[in-house]
Amino acid sequence: MLDRIIINKEPKFFITEETAMEKNKYAGTQTEKNLEAAFAGESQARNKYTYFASVAKKEGYEQMAALFLSTAENEKEHAKLWFKELGGIGNTAENLLEAAAGENYEWTDMYAGFAETAEKEGFKALAAKFRLVAAIEKRHEERYRALLKNLENAEVFERSEVKIWECRNCGHIVVGTKAPVVCPTCAHPQAFFEIMAENY
């Protein structure tokens, strides 16, 4: 649903029409279209205002930057209202699946088509950018699918082999096959643990 709202093109969904109707009581109505437009407009406004805040900050206008950011947060909440009405927020597994489907559409269809059109119209540099972003979207899809697999296999906080687990709150390290239920240092719950990434 998110992809259709943002890019106005129906992606390949992994949910049935019946499920969609249960989640979205507005399906097939003009009100649904209005909610989609409201969600898209508020989402785009939020992003624009964060970009505008960066410019104001660089130009030395802290108050204006803060107001842009404050308004962006308001727009985020407005967008969330409409997205919830559309039944667009599921549980984490559903959200990962929806996100993966959206990223798949972006790299396999949307950006590929945009690049082809830009190329035909003589915008070779832009076509190259579309292709570069498509490669990033492919990686996003892979990441969401890997996280979904971890969730489905109950491997978010436990693995069959020894791993180094790091608390995202305080940095406490645990070596073992699973993350502790509670961090022994800061008492944050297991949800704050992840497999330590050493990419430096």
Locate the predicted segments by residue:
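Non-heme di-metal
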Residues: 17-200
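Short, Lys/Arg-enriched N-terminal segments with co-localized hydrophobic residues
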Residues: 4-20
